[in-house]
A protein has these predicted regions:
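Aromatic (phenylalanine/tyrosine) cluster motif
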Residues: 8-13, 61, 174, 248, ...
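Extracellular/surface-exposed low-complexity segments
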Residues: 22-70, 74, 325, 348-481
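Surface-exposed loop/turn motifs in large extracellular/passenger domains
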Residues: 89-97, 114-133, 141-165, 173-192, ...
Length: 635
């Protein structure tokens, strides 16, 4: 009896100790608790309004047990280690919150998605290097990593959907009919599809990108994103970068098969579409029939395509609108470094399209090629009009075609020809813009018959001027002579000038200035000839009392300047000759125009001549007024 009783007591003691140990382990282990976005101190209401709760306690998941859903068909799990599944995670009409917790989630079953068939899927990663994917090869491809089923939703806040290789659309994520993806953060990267949408694809669903990165994915069409069959893409933040397509749309591909299946892409905010490439057309964005793309913000830059380095507007059924955006630094081996325009292109508000190039396949030949207007296609202007600080460079297949449809105002200072032999002119009757050459006498008049002094000094009267916008070097001919006219206001970073050269400048109603206050705007020319065929042109407008510049124009020893029009004005300096400084034996001939409102703390507010110089100032017409200096307007 004693032995039995002792044995019973020992058994009870052991069981009690086991119980105490289990309770002790439970009560001291840390709970995995944070907002469903992965942050512990989250206060971002904008990204959370679609979901109810912010603070969540997750239960551990290592892939060895089934996920337990509560009475509301909801579960919260976090990975305790890298997990490789044999079947998909998913449950009908269920909501699943997953924190990757810095681990990898994959599957050995290549014929089914890693995650599938959930009503709502919410993914975050509180650590920062978690990943879903990492499966499939070119020889043994998988299907997409995540399938967002019909009428279901997925929310991505963190983690990577990465390294999936598939032969179906949407290697990373596929959005089914009437389903939605909301991407607030995280990365979709390094996925590869032999079909459309290396990163994300949808047919009749909606892709919403509010943040995060879609990077380095590969597909036949739509390296980063693909939308088809009434689908929609809304991108208001984040980046689409370094994706590659062998066909259309290195970054984004939009394709509607017919009028009832038109697709839509809306791009806004600070979105960046950068560094994407297509072996076919549309390096940044490629459309193919029945697609509407609205770009109301962001930047499209440094993309490459066979046609349409930045954007491909494929056909008459493709509609593009651009406002408050920039398209810069894209390249093509065909036509349209920025945009290949063969459909409908509408611009409004502030649009910057410049610095895009044609680059030959061997890389040896480059030329300015921004918006390429195919055949007789043109640009239209939206209801908001085009702002004065817009800059749109164009190339025409047919130089006799109109560049624009009817514009309510003259935008010839905002729309500029890539071909420097042509300028853009506005016709007030038709309200359209077209190309024209800039030709007139050196004095600025088109009907000049003046044989008096001022014209006999120089040989040519009828001059064809080339456009100069400050982005390219001036080309001088065999006689070391160049003729340039400004297509818009130009601010230089270095002086205009070439030793021993003659430069004819028509200001064409625009301002010529420089951000470099330590160098003249114009310097070191043998002969400088200035005119202004419009009448409001100006050289200067720089320097302050606190930050003075040097003189606007410096004429070297034994050189000459001839002024027929325009104003040398509003220069503030602490050196001689705020407007013009003449070197020894240099001369200033004035037949029109003005030198005014210049200011110096030294001598010659308007013009300064060296005291011992044999040159001088010869005033035949024009105005030197309202300048200020220690000594005189002209000294």
């Amino acid at each position: 009896m004693r032995i039995k009783k002792l044995g019973f007591l020992m058994f009870t003691f052991v069981v009690a100790m086991m119980f105490i140990q289990v309770v002790y382990a439970d009560t001291t282990s840390e709970q995995h608790t944070h907002c469903f976005c992965g942050k512990t101190d989250c206060n971002n209401g904008k990204q959370h309004s679609i979901l109810a709760s912010k603070e969540i306690t997750y239960t551990p998941f290592d892939g060895t047990t089934q996920i337990a859903y509560d009475s509301n068909r909801c579960a919260y799990i976090y990975l305790t280690k890298d997990v490789t599944l044999s079947v998909s995670i998913g449950a009908t009409n269920a909501t699943l919150y997953i924190c990757l917790n810095g681990h990898k989630l994959s599957s050995s079953n290549l014929s089914s998605p890693i995650i599938n068939n959930l009503k709502n899927l919410v993914i975050c990663d509180c650590v920062g290097n978690g990943e879903i994917g990492n499966r499939g090869t070119s020889e043994s491809p998988a299907i997409q990593a995540i399938n967002v089923a019909t009428n279901c939703n997925a929310y991505l806040y963190g983690g990577k959907i990465a390294n999936n290789i598939t032969n179906c659309s949407g290697a990373g994520i596929f959005i089914a009919k009437s389903a939605n993806l909301y991407m607030y953060g995280g990365t979709v990267a390094n996925n590869k599809s032999t079909q459309d949408g290396g990163g994300i694809a949808t047919e009749t669903g909606t892709i919403n990108v509010l943040g995060g990165t879609i990077d380095s994915n590969i597909a036949s069409n739509g390296g980063g994103l693909s939308v088809a069959k009434k689908g929609k893409i809304n991108i208001s933040g984040g980046s689409v970068s370094n994706n590659v397509a062998s066909g259309f749309g290195g970054g984004i591909y939009a394709y509607g098969s017919n009028s009832s299946n038109r697709v839509t892409a809306n791009i806004s905010g600070n979105t960046e579409i950068i560094g994407n490439a297509s072996g076919g057309n549309g390096g940044g964005i490629g459309t193919k029939d029945y697609a509407t793309v609205n770009v109301s913000g962001g930047t499209i830059k440094e993309n490459k395509g066979a046609n349409g380095g930045g954007i491909l507007v494929y056909s008459k059924w493709c509609y593009f609108t651009l406002s408050n955006c920039s398209i810069i630094g894209n390249t093509t081996t065909g036509k349209g470094g920025a945009i290949y325009q063969n459909g409908s292109l509408d611009v409004s508000n502030k649009v910057l399209i410049y610095g895009n190039k044609y680059v030959s396949s061997d890389g040896k030949t480059t030329s300015n090629n921004n918006v390429q207007l195919i055949l007789s296609k043109s640009i239209t202007c939206g209801a908001g009009g085009l702002s004065s600080n817009s800059m749109i460079y164009v190339t025409l297949d047919n130089k006799s075609s109109a560049i624009t449809g009817a514009f309510n105002e003259d935008c010839s200072s905002q729309i500029i020809s890539d071909d420097k032999n042509y300028f853009v002119a506005y016709d007030k009757t038709s309200k359209t813009h077209s190309l024209t050459q800039h030709t007139h006498c050196i004095c600025g008049k088109t009907d000049c018959d003046d044989t008096s002094v001022g014209h006999s000094i120089l040989e040519k009267k009828g001059v064809v001027y080339k456009a100069f916008d400050g982005t390219d070097e001036i080309e001088y001919d065999a006689n070391n002579c160049a003729y340039i006219a400004l297509p818009r206001d130009v601010t230089l970073s270095n002086s205009l000038g070439k030793e021993g050269a003659t430069l004819y400048i028509c200001l064409n109603g625009h301002k010529l200035s420089s951000s470099n206050l330590e160098a003249p705007i114009i310097n070191n020319l043998k002969n400088l000839v200035i005119c202004d065929c419009v009448g409001t042109g100006e050289i200067g407008n720089r320097g302050t009392d606190d930050s003075p510049a040097v003189q606007a124009i410096n004429i070297a020893n034994d050189c000459n300047v001839y002024v027929y029009g325009g104003s040398i004005a509003n220069n503030i300096t602490n050196s001689n000759g705020a407007g013009v400084l003449l070197g020894d034996s240099a001369s200033f001939y004035m037949y029109g125009g003005s030198v005014k409102k210049n200011k110096t703390t030294q001598n010659g507010g308007g013009i300064s001549v060296q005291p011992s110089s044999s040159g001088g100032v010869y005033l035949y017409n024009g105005e030197i007024s309202d300048n200020s200096a220690v000594n005189a307007h002209v000294r």
